[in-house]
């Protein structure tokens, strides 16, 4: 091995160790990554194992406990993995900002590194919400909810305080139930826009019905009073002003 190769290898190893130490020194103490299975997850594992076994003794109980422990450890590793990736994406974005690079550079970098943009932005959003949480308890609570729910919670508009309230409501729920609760308290932007459109259409329908009634009365030959003529005049003026602004 050449001297240059040895130096490069030593530098890489030292840099990797420093990065790991720096990551753990901040807020990412390993106890944050210890994920406890929810009661629903424990029940699912028990039902799965019970359905495939007919012998229930001490060995069976030890095996079941080990499976639950290993499942929790796997989930911990998965969540640590997402946070590590999210942290790196976050750092790259900050570096590009400091270099005064356009937003398209970051987007192009995402395309270069990741198979799908959604996976990158999910990890970034997950990390950003995680570091904004106030303490280890809330971080652990966030780590305990299903992935899809966590990604959706991170992506929704709302303050950290609002998200903490929702987090308390969805903790321990299955993914489907958690998303239902999340949609109720922090609806997606598209849903809000849809609701506004529906409201707009309903109000216009109501106006149409009233205008048709007025048109029928006027067409019947009724002579309008000056007061009613003035009201119609104001209506036309208001309508024309709205059209001009549009």
Swiss-Prot record:
One Pfam family, short name: UPF0137
Keyword tags: Plasmid
InterPro entries found in the cross-reference section: UPF0137
Domain of life: Bacteria
Family: Belongs to the UPF0137 (pGP6-D) family.
Protein name per its UniProtKB record: Virulence plasmid protein pGP6-D
The species this protein was found in: Chlamydia psittaci (Chlamydophila psittaci)
